[in-house]
């Protein structure tokens, strides 16, 4: 797999966007202390000045596309690219994502773009409840397709852990708590709040970290515990009232 450092990414973004590049922000696990080497990717937010609303010229657009492809080939999602105006007016649409970015970030280029950006608890609760139910349905579908295949069950557990932690951090923010950097502590606290056993998630964290891989006899039970926990979390959020 090709490699590209964050410094090289910023250099290429500056060359592609020139004066339109306002800010580049690293967010997520790599900025929050729970990055897993050789497994976690790097999430990057790119903010552009509109400069009179004119579209990118063809050479700039082509250069930006080449940067995104190279970053993707290095194992990372393409940069999330927005205009400054879009960034400033979208926190009510993506409150979970904004809350995560606001709390776990590192500015790589330009000015910090966070002044005046807020996330309301009502917006957060609405998106969180929808996302939890959506994840529950995805897990059920994945479990059906995996059947009793332990390898596919383990892959589903590993692939879903990052999203689970995004949801869990949002639950803690809904309660006015700052999520711990450690995924074990996060899952344990959310389990206590919502009334589910966090053990399947703690086991999944060890699996993903490479500390103790899931055995064939464990995978089905861990996946089943995942589904049961998210079912309970969905019920909890449906009945949740702010203190």
Where are these regions (language model features)?
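Metal-dependent nucleotidyltransferase catalytic core
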Residues: 1-17, 32-39, 44-94
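A nucleotide- and high-energy phosphate-metabolite-utilizing enzyme signature
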Residues: 4-7, 17, 21, 105-109, ...
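Conserved nucleotidyltransferase catalytic core and NTase-mimicking acidic/glycine-rich helix/loop elements
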Residues: 6, 118-243
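Secondary-structure boundary/capping signal
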Residues: 21, 75-79, 109, 179, ...
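Short gly/ser-rich loop at a beta-strand->alpha-helix junction or flexible surface loop bordering the NTP-binding
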Residues: 22-30
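Conserved NTP/Mg2+-binding pocket subregion across the NTase superfamily
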Residues: 65-155, 242
